[in-house]
């Protein structure tokens, strides 16, 4: 089974994205989808994340990396069935195919929770080098388990920056500073921000102290390395409950 066949089996086709959404990906490097997850789905994910965090504590995210001031979870698909619905978000799958335009697979799955008074990130990209426009390798997403508000650590994005062929650290004096063209993404829980990994973005300071749990589910070119090699961590439980289409995309 190839990627296109897998997407067809999951109900994704050329009409999944509207012309306006495709234009947003082309011009801005991101789109916002509201109601990407049902309330009962993200409520279960919040509960499961918190339960796993009680066990993993400061080690949470160890499979990829840990972060002071932002509790993390990595390898979530192997740890809980509640996160499976993320693999069914059709606009995300369609966007990955639209941007990458060839065979792709899951790159990584992480959850990040910016703690009160923490969470500020440098503006960055999620790909390790600058690329020419069109030479894209990763599509990332922010799946909001809590609302993004102006003061709880919402993401800032620089629209159109994926077309620059540059990385923020190469042109900004300090990527922690505000960028003159950045916008703050505010949206209700269940929303999904889909972004080209070369679009400049970063988390902001959680001033209010409200919860700000967000899933990062990314897809990469099939021949590129995964953030977490799925076959090294694949459990029998995940293998048994995944359809052939899902297994194809998990690689």
Located regions from the model:
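Active-site lining segments that contact anionic ligands and/or coordinate catalytic metals
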Residues: 182, 189, 210-214
